[in-house]
Each structure stands twice: as C-alpha cells, then as structure tokens.
C-alpha cells in the first residue's frame, strides 16, 4: 500500500480492529520510509443484487424501500422502528446469503410477509392488501381466514 505522504510502497500494520458493524477492518499503518502513520479500511467487495420487478425491469436492491413499506404497514401499530429495521436487515442478509445476482420482487414481498406475520398480524394484513392488490372485501376475509387457520 502506497504511503499517502511519500508514495513509498512498504508499510507495517501498527493496529488492526473491526469497525462497530463488523463489516470493515480499520488498520493503522506506518510508512517504513517516512515513519508517518495513516489509516486504511479493508472491506469485502459487495456485488449489487438486482431486483426483477413484475414488468421484468431491474433495479438495485434497496433496503430503504423495505423499511418505508414496513413503516406504512405498521403505522399506529405497536411495532417499533427497531423491529422494522431488524426485519429489513434479516431480509437483506437472507438475500446476501443466497449469493445470487438477481431476485424477484415477489420473493422479497413473500419474505417481508413471513417476517411481518410473526411481529404483528394487522400490519401483515395491511402489507398483504397492497402487495397482493386485494380487489374487494372478500379477498381481505380470505387472507384473514388463512391467518387464523395457520
């Protein structure tokens, strides 16, 4: 690694530690030529996951979209911001663990509903009504019936 002060290419690592979120390693280095210290960060290279939408267009996965959808579904319900962020984080990790470059928006929606059902059933029905595009009250009743049976 080149020293930012003198461009010498050799250095030694003086200190190394993980950042708070454990996704990056912070290293303090000392140049073997000028003896000045500098900080570098080492991180695993992320490959963006593309979401394939119903109309077959693709866009980058965005955890914030999940959070925003959950905030709307959970409005005036006993669901904390932390619970919402935890759901979004778990879904993001699940997608990342699949090691895929593309995922269908349908799959993400199902993952959200599975998690939301465990947290708050009313929020689940709200989310499902928009996600599954309920057309009438009978569709609502059918979903609630399935929720009660399971």
Swiss-Prot record:
Superkingdom per UniProt: Bacteria
Sequence ranges assigned to domain ATP-cone in this UniProt record: 49-139
Keyword annotations: ATP-binding, DNA-binding, Metal-binding, Nucleotide-binding, Repressor, Transcription, Transcription regulation, Zinc, Zinc-finger
Zinc fingers typed unnamed, residue spans: 3-34
One Pfam family from the record: ATP-cone
Keyword ATP-binding belongs to the record: yes
MF terms (GO), sorted A to Z: ATP binding; DNA binding; zinc ion binding
Obligatory cofactor(s): Zn(2+)
GO biological process: negative regulation of DNA-templated transcription
Record-linked PROSITE patterns: ATP_CONE
Xref: InterPro entries: ATP-cone_dom, NrdR-like_N, RNR_NrdR-like
Note describing how the cofactor binds: Binds 1 zinc ion.
Record flagged with keyword ATP-binding: yes
Primary role: Negatively regulates transcription of bacterial ribonucleotide reductase nrd genes and operons by binding to NrdR-boxes.
NCBIfam families found in the cross-reference section: transcriptional regulator NrdR (TIGR00244)
Family statement drawn from the similarity comment of this UniProt entry: Belongs to the NrdR family.
Stated name of the protein: Transcriptional repressor NrdR
């Amino acid at each position: 690694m080149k020293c930012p002060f003198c461009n010498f290419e050799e250095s030694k690592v003086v200190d190394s530690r993980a950042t708070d979120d454990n996704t990056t390693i912070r290293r303090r280095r000392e140049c073997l030529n000028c003896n000045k210290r500098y900080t570098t960060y080492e991180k695993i290279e992320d490959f963006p996951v593309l979401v394939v939408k119903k109309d077959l267009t693709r866009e980058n996965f965005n955890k914030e979209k999940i959070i925003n959808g959950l905030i709307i579904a959970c409005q005036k319900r006993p669901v904390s911001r932390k619970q919402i962020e935890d759901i979004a984080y778990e879904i993001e990790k699940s997608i990342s663990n699949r090691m895929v470059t593309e995922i269908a928006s349908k799959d993400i929606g199902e993952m959200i509903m599975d998690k939301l059902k465990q947290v708050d059933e009313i929020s689940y029905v709200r989310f499902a009504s928009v996600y599954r595009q309920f057309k009438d009250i009978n569709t609502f009743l059918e979903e609630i019936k399935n929720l009660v049976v399971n």
